A protein has these predicted regions:
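P-loop NTPase Walker
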Residues: 1-108, 522
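Conserved RecA-like helicase ATPase core segment
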Residues: 5, 11, 48, 181-267
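Conserved helicase/translocase P-loop NTPase motor core
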Residues: 93, 129-165, 175-181, 460-463, ...
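Conserved helicase core region in the C-terminal RecA-like lobe
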Residues: 93-102, 196, 452-505, 512-535
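Helicase P-loop NTPase motor core
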Residues: 223-224, 231-327
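ATPase/helicase motor core of nucleic-acid motors
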Residues: 298-425, 432
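Accessory C-terminal helicase-associated subdomains
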Residues: 376-481, 502, 558
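C-terminal accessory regions
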Residues: 388-406, 496-572
Length: 572
């Protein structure tokens, strides 16, 4: 145990008085943190403080709830890094959907028989596809979980007794059902609740995210509001630009915005909005720019992101991906892969594939070992024996040197055998999300299908595994998937009506898409390019009637708008 008065932040990091006060706060608190404010680090340090000072002593735990799987995974990894494996075992990180599903799956039996779901029920996205028996939406699942905890006071008491501290990340994206669920369990309890978010980055408004969630939380939980403005991510000029855009779109009351604007001077080489004639020329020019960043500016490919509002059938990513490949630059489309890799099964599989394709990789081995030991509790002799069996299996399944010519079918067989031999019986027991539905099969085959495709673009299995892991590859994803990530350079592709205002514009829709754009802008550290094309094969002639409202604001505050003719070479 460390005394709270002498506790210091981990990793040699220093925090200002406000951030340190948030870390050490032992009452309900809401934190409004702008882009680049380091909220993941602050939450990780707060978890360390709570665990190391024994404010949350064994057998109590910390519950962390996120909206996205990768966010839940990121905060768990950061806490493990900051306070070590043993203490971080008591930091339980879930998505809100996974947490509510775990309650439904484990305690559904407390309901009347006619209210219980069928075995193997399926989660659907559209309420029209649900029947509340064997098919239901995530909102219906949350409503059912809320009914269960209301129906069973003992269960509610158990949850409260298990989790003394609660973190809720991306709080602005919780909808009414999810907020009511959290409120029902933890409001007026002994649990201490911390919520973190940024209303400017509320990208789940289309899913009925609460517009006044922070106000409700402060009122219901008697919480204090703290605001962190500091942006540690972006360059000074980009930070100024982002701040100005945020103030223009969501002005504070009783503040003369125009009088307080410090206009950013943005270099056109690093911050521009390009208009191309068609998507082919767009892809060629932007690929050359990415190649220039890699070769001349020494930016690693994985530090470059190409973002889109939507990417159905890879319409937006395919052209630029092909052009990059012609230049010898690999890219990976993470829109689906990102979810798979954030799963425990995804981490097991990617660690295994890494060890299949390299003589040794310490990080991959430690990840695989820790996940295996997490599944099995046994004595040290049994552990050593089982781990030696895993190592023997890996050594006999090489996909480099003499094994470099093995086929995908060989790799699939080895992967299936490994999972059956070492993880199968425990997988859905330890991680309940695999008990029902298709998530286990989707994750396993989703990753291997991506690997098969990556092998067609690579000269070896090692390169293919690197590619799907995002090593040495430009990353392509939707803006929603980029939430919480940061990159040295960002290209926002397809700023046109079809992507953002296909069904027209209302004030609500404009506010929603401003938040989406704001998330994209704030992913960049030092370079930000925005692109549109007058023609695309899948949409035809592009229109800018509605999106011009956003474009005009971007140029007003410093983004350079440039027309790039088809005849132009690397004008950009």
């Amino acid at each position: 145990m460390i005394d709270a008065s002498v506790w210091e932040p981990k990793g040699g990091l220093k925090f200002d008085d406000k951030s340190l006060g948030i870390i050490k706060c032992n009452s309900n608190i809401s934190i409004m943190a702008g882009p680049g404010a380091g909220k993941t680090e602050i939450l990780a340090q707060k978890a360390c403080f709570i665990l190391e000072t024994e404010l949350c002593a064994w057998p109590y735990n910390i519950l962390s709830i996120s909206r996205k799987r990768e966010s839940a995974s990121n905060i768990k990894n950061r806490v493990s890094l900051r306070c070590g494996k043993v203490l971080s075992e008591r930091f339980h990180s879930f998505t809100i959907e996974a947490f509510t599903k775990s309650i439904v799956d484990r305690f559904m039996y407390v309901l009347h028989k006619h209210e219980q779901l069928s075995d193997g029920y399926e989660l659907v996205y559209n309420v029209r596809d649900s029947n509340f028996k064997d098919k239901l939406t995530f909102d219906q699942l949350t409503i059912l979980a809320l009914k269960i905890v209301h129906f069973s006071p003992d269960l509610m008491s158990t949850i409260r007794a298990t989790y003394k501290y609660i973190f809720i990340d991306e709080f602005q994206d919780l909808n009414g059902h999810q907020y009511n669920f959290v409120k029902a369990i933890f409001c007026k309890s002994q649990s201490v609740v911390t919520v973190v978010g940024d209303t400017k980055q509320a990208i789940m408004k289309f899913a009925n995210a609460l517009p006044d969630g922070f106000i409700k939380f402060e009122r219901d939980f008697q919480a204090e509001l703290k605001v962190i403005h500091t942006n540690f991510r972006s360059s000074p000029e980009l930070k100024r630009f982002i701040d100005n855009i945020g103030n223009e779109w969501w002005p504070m009351l009783n503040v003369n915005i125009e009088a307080n604007i410090d206009y950013a001077k943005l270099n056109k080489d690093n911050y521009s909005l390009f208009g191309f004639d068609d998507e082919e020329h767009e892809a060629k020019q932007l690929s050359l720019k990415i190649k220039q960043w890699i070769d001349k500016d020494n930016i690693r490919p994985e530090e470059i992101a190409v973002l889109f509002r939507v990417n159905s059938n890879n319409y937006y990513s395919q052209n630029i991906s092909n052009e990059l490949l012609n230049l010898g630059v690999l890219s990976v489309n993470e829109s689906n892969l990102q979810d798979y890799l954030s799963e425990p099964l995804g981490k097991i599989l990617i660690s295994l594939l890494t060890l299949f394709t390299r003589t040794r990789n310490v990080d991959a081995w430690e990840c695989l070992r820790d996940l295996y030991l997490h599944c099995y509790s046994s004595n040290s002799f049994d552990e050593d024996y089982k781990l030696s069996q895993i190592l023997e299996f890996i050594n006999n399944s090489k996909y480099y040197n003499e094994g470099a010519d093995k086929t995908f079918e060989n790799l699939l067989d080895d992967s299936v055998k490994f999972m059956n031999d070492f993880f199968h019986e425990k997988l859905d027991e330890v991680w309940i999300q695999y008990k029902q539905g298709t998530l286990r099969d989707d994750t396993f085959h989703g990753i291997l299908d991506e690997l098969k495709e990556a092998k067609n673009l690579s000269s070896s299995w090692t390169e293919a595994v690197d590619l799907i892991s995002g090593v040495g590859a430009v990353r392509m994803m939707t803006i929603h998937k980029s939430k919480g990530l940061e990159f040295e350079a960002v290209i926002l592709l397809g700023l046109e009506d079809c992507s953002y205002f296909r069904f027209g514009m209302t004030s609500k829709k404009l506010d929603e898409e401003r938040s989406t754009i704001f998330v994209a802008l704030s992913r960049a550290k030092s370079k930000l390019l925005i692109s549109s094309a007058l023609n695309r094969k899948h949409t035809g002639q592009s229109e800018f009637i509605h999106v011009n409202t956003i474009i005009n604001d971007l140029t007003k505050f410093g983004i350079n708008k440039m027309r790039v003719e088809t005849s132009d070479a690397l004008k950009i």
